[in-house]
């Protein structure tokens, strides 16, 4: 699955 940081930080 994807991580939450990919949409938050990136």
UniProtKB/Swiss-Prot annotation:
Primary localization class, coarse: secreted
Residue pairs linked by disulfide bridges in the UniProt entry: none
GO biological process, one term: neuropeptide signaling pathway
Subcellular location: Secreted; Cytoplasmic vesicle, Secretory vesicle lumen
The keyword Disulfide bond belongs to this UniProt entry's keyword annotation: no
Family indicated by similarity: Belongs to the bombesin/neuromedin-B/ranatensin family.
The protein's role, per its UniProt record: Stimulates the release of gastrin and other gastrointestinal hormones.
Name of the molecule in the record: Neuromedin-C
Organism: Pelophylax ridibundus (Marsh frog)
């Amino acid at each position: 699955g994807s991580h939450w940081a990919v949409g938050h930080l990136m």
